[in-house]
Amino acid sequence: QIIDQLENIGVEPKIVTLKKDEEVYDCHLAKVEYGVTLLFVNVTESVNATKMRQEFFSNVSHELKTPMTSIRGYSELLQAGMINDPKVRKQSLDKIQKEVDHMSQLIGDILMISRLENKDIEVIKHPVHLQPIVDDILESLKVEIEKRKIKVICDLTPQTYLANHQHVQQLMNNLINNAVKYNKQKGNLNIHSYLVDQDYIIEVSDTGRGISLIDQGRVFERFFRCDAGRDKETGGTGLGLAIVKHIVQYYKGTIHLESELGKGTTFKVVLPIIKDSL
């Protein structure tokens, strides 16, 4: 490819894009007095970032369009008086509410990731109890958990952690939602928190599909979704785990992932305990 370009190179420099071993390079070709210069620039990161942004906006567009279509359809039927059965009317209104909640969550995730990346986040901290936060999240997922007969095992330390309540709620919500979303029928969901030395540790495990070794290295990236084709049935924008990682890093903690395809996934969050956090 470069040789072909060299044969046609004129006075003006040329840029040729090359791919090798999943890496992308821009090759800058220019004539000099005694020949030709070639400058190779690795643009893989830039190309991947552009691709991920395009996929993200495509996902967001789809995630917004689907509930909007549903809301409009049910609203038009109700407005036209075409749904007279009280039970069916309630089901229609419940569906509208569910879609509104979905859009609200989507918009909230987009705003959250933007604030985290721009370091524009709330810093007021209070002692946070994990139990009521987890209870509220499980209650919001009760229908899905019961429908799929997922067994929930919850063992949380009564100790508090000094943090912003919204951050802890967002962190737990994203981890638990994923554990339910990707779990198998009659699977297990384990939520634990405990203290080890000067660390406050949270573990969320499921017995679902698992994450491949290749994807494990990228699950915390913005916009990334494991096996995008397979995820169409579950939805999502690829922001949940990116938000989790940003929150954990804000508290100078770490997050670890253990997973095996077909057996499940465990996320382990380690947060350092600071003075007066208990």
Residue ranges and their predicted role:
Residues 79-87:
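Short acidic helix/loop segment immediately C-terminal to the autophosphorylated histidine
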Residues 1-45:
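PAS-family sensory/regulatory modules and their coupling/dimerization elements
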Residues 98-103, 107:
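Short alpha-helical segment of the dimerization/phosphotransfer core of two-component systems
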Residues 211-223:
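Short conserved segment of the HATPase_c
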Residues 252-253:
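Conserved glycine-rich
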Residues 186-198:
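Short beta-strand/loop element within the Bergerat-fold HATPase_c
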Residues 118-123, 156, 160-166:
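Conserved micro-motifs of the catalytic ATP-binding
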